[in-house]
Amino acid sequence: METLVLEKNKSAYKLQNIPPIYYINLDGEPERKIYMESQFKYWEIENYTRISAYDGRDDDLSDIIKGTYPVNMTSGEVGCTTSHLKAIKHWYETSDSSYALIMEDDIDLDLVKFWNFTWKDFMRGLPYDWDVVQLAIICTGSIHVKLHKRFVNDFSTACYMINRHHAEKLLKFHERNGKYKLDNGA
């Protein structure tokens, strides 16, 4: 990852009123922290929080799991899932904002400069009953540009916006006194 050159960003106005951002970053990846925070500076985003990620690849995470360790998930998936639940919980308990952006530390905001809309325009276009809006996908085929209901092949935890109501549902289902219950479907 390279550090951004910080020339004047003439498109930063497009992200005015963006909700608080919670980005997930492994403690052992300081260059990704620098990368993300240089992007936030470039885009004039000040309302962000780093969430220390759980590394399921190398660490035994059984001490943060409540119930049966999920056998249908890889250790990396357990680390990813619990890190996202940790980020959601942190936002839910420390902020009164109606919604938040949760993102991983390899998101590239560069495409925002090509938007022909602002964040405010984007928010006005959302269905009134949204719970989660996926803002980045892993796509092995065509990319759908318009807002659409979830498709089976669109998956990613790279970046999404979540509202308080849905966060509360997820936490009630998966969080038990600082531990994460994943044997009930994650």
State the predicted function of each range.
Residues 1-103, 107-186:
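An acidic/histidine-cluster motif and surrounding catalytic segment
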